[in-house]
């Protein structure tokens, strides 16, 4: 007999990290989604500001796939409280899908391990981006820095050195169907030279984040393929990146499909000066901007305070 009700929270995330398109992501504690699941007469979604039809909602699609695969006969009511800003490149859709997969697994005692939940949450991303990419959902499920394998949809958590700090530059810039559009700009093929450069950068970035090597991370946080293709959407990006580096930051990349930017910095960075100069860039373009300085987060977890209807 399944439990009657439970609630979980799932962290935001930044994907790609420059050269690691659909391969790298990192979970942060800046924002969380909370998802409540309980038995009901049918599958129902309750949420504000996002689609509530199960087949158009990331949590709903995740639930539909799990219901199908495990022959779940009970109805499920899924209530979603969006703590993660939607459409800003912070893994909002993936967080809801991750939370739904984790909650349904626990509600019905399905016995799945965290790594097994990734494929179900990735299915949910179809509702947002049109493709089941597992990078954000892997970070929200496992926490930490994740390396994703598209084959078989699996991921591995890697611990990040405490030498580094993180700044999220969050522009209040909404673009309709942004993730689908941003993914449509990605080239279908690349030259061998670009492939070798990005492979080297991904290796440098992972090794540097693990070991605390500033130079490796700085080298790794660059990309001439996906970010270059998407640059017209975010005309401020290069100026923000250059300003961050001039202020002593380790590096800067577009967070996921943007418009948010992730800056990695350390004790050599003139942080206040950097934030002040970056703010001026956005002010000059008439764009509102906010900043967050998150810690690396653990993955989705159950909480004791269910959402009120």
Swiss-Prot record:
Gene Ontology annotations of biological process type: threonine biosynthetic process
Its Enzyme Commission number? 2.7.1.39
Gene3D superfamilies (UniProt xref):
3.30.230.10, GHMP kinase, C-terminal domain (3.30.70.890)
Gene Ontology MF terms = ATP binding; homoserine kinase activity
Name the residues that bind ATP. 85-95
Question: Which UniProt keyword terms apply here?
Answer: Amino-acid biosynthesis, ATP-binding, Cytoplasm, Kinase, Nucleotide-binding, Threonine biosynthesis, Transferase
Family matches, as Pfam families: GHMP_kinases_C (PF08544), GHMP_kinases_N (PF00288)
What SUPFAM superfamilies does the annotation carry?
Answer: GHMP Kinase, C-terminal domain (SSF55060), Ribosomal protein S5 domain 2-like (SSF54211)
Pathway the protein contributes to: Amino-acid biosynthesis; L-threonine biosynthesis; L-threonine from L-aspartate: step 4/5
Chief location bin: cytoplasm
Q: Looking at the UniProt record for this protein, which Gene Ontology cellular component terms does it annotate, in alphabetical order?
A: cytoplasm
Reaction catalysed by this enzyme: L-homoserine + ATP = O-phospho-L-homoserine + ADP + H(+)
Q: Which domain of life is it from?
A: Archaea
Location in the cell reads: Cytoplasm
The answer to whether the entry has keyword Cell inner membrane is: no
The answer to whether the entry has keyword Endoplasmic reticulum is no
PANTHER family assigned = HOMOSERINE KINASE (PTHR20861:SF1), HOMOSERINE/4-DIPHOSPHOCYTIDYL-2-C-METHYL-D-ERYTHRITOL KINASE (PTHR20861)
Return the NCBIfam families for the record.
PRK01212.1-4, thrB
- Give a short account of what the protein does: Catalyzes the ATP-dependent phosphorylation of L-homoserine to L-homoserine phosphate.
**Similarity-based family:** Belongs to the GHMP kinase family. Homoserine kinase subfamily.
Protein name as annotated:
Homoserine kinase
| Gene transcribed to yield this protein | thrB
């Amino acid at each position: 007999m399944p439990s009657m009700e439970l609630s979980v929270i799932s962290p935001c995330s930044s994907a790609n990290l420059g050269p690691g398109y659909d391969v790298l992501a990192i979970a942060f504690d800046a924002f969380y989604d909370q998802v409540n699941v309980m038995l009901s007469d049918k599958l129902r979604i309750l949420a504000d500001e996002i689609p509530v039809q199960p087949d158009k909602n990331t949590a709903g699609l995740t639930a539909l796939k799990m219901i199908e695969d495990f022959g779940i006969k009970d109805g499920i009511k899924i209530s979603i409280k969006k703590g993660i800003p939607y459409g800003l490149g912070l893994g909002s859709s993936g967080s809801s899908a991750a939370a739904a997969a984790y909650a349904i697994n626990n509600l019905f005692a399905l016995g799945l391990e965290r790594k097994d939940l990734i494929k179900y949450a990735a299915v949910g991303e179809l509702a947002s981006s049109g493709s089941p990419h597992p990078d954000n959902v892997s970070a929200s499920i496992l926490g930490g820095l994740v390396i994703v394998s598209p084959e078989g949809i699996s991921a591995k958590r890697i611990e990040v050195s405490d030498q580094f700090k993180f700044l999220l530059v969050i522009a209040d810039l909404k673009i309709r169907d942004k993730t689908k559009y941003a993914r449509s700009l990605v080239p279908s093929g690349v030259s061998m030279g670009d492939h070798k450069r990005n492979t080297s950068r991904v290796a440098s970035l992972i090794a540097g984040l693990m070991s605390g090597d500033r130079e490796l991370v700085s080298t790794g946080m660059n990309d001439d393929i996906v970010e270059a293709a998407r640059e017209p959407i975010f005309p401020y990006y290069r100026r923000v990146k250059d300003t961050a580096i001039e202020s002593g930051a380790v590096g800067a990349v577009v967070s996921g499909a943007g418009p948010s930017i992730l800056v990695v910095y350390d004790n050599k960075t003139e942080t206040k000066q950097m934030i002040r100069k970056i703010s001026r860039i956005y002010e000059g373009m008439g764009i509102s901007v906010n900043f967050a300085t998150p810690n690396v987060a653990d993955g989705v977890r159950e909480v004791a305070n269910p959402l009120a209807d």
